[in-house]
């Protein structure tokens, strides 16, 4: 199985992932990610694990991320930081989630230059 890096989204100078991107990468559903977040909400810190985007900032984001249909009609949006993606991997606790998280850290969150073409990874499955 090949993993393709998600579309790069940056908010306030921080690379983030949408709930849909995390779910797709970790091989689960968006609903499972949302459930785990609400179930463990006390462990997530706004600004550290996730960023809430609303108002004019969200409108600007929608204009720059035209491929992200998952939040086209959202009034507010939670975007997950590297540390938030870690908490989701911990909640899921699957081999795939851990493998993908490690890959995202190396090639998505900490990548310094823009990629000209998608980067893919072979997974064990």
Describe each PLM feature range:
Residues 1-123:
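An anion-engaging/catalytic patch
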């Amino acid at each position: 199985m090949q993993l393709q890096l998600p579309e790069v989204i940056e908010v306030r100078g921080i690379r983030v992932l949408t709930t849909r991107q995390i779910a797709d990468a970790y091989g689960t559903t968006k609903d499972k990610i949302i459930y785990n977040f609400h179930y463990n909400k006390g462990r997530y810190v706004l600004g550290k694990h996730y960023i809430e985007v609303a108002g004019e900032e969200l409108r600007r984001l929608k204009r720059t991320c035209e491929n992200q249909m998952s939040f086209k009609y959202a009034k507010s949006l939670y975007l997950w930081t590297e540390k938030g993606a870690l908490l989701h991997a911990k909640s899921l606790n699957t081999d795939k989630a851990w493998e993908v998280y490690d890959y995202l850290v190396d090639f998505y969150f900490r990548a310094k230059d823009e990629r000209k073409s998608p980067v893919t990874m072979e997974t064990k499955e």
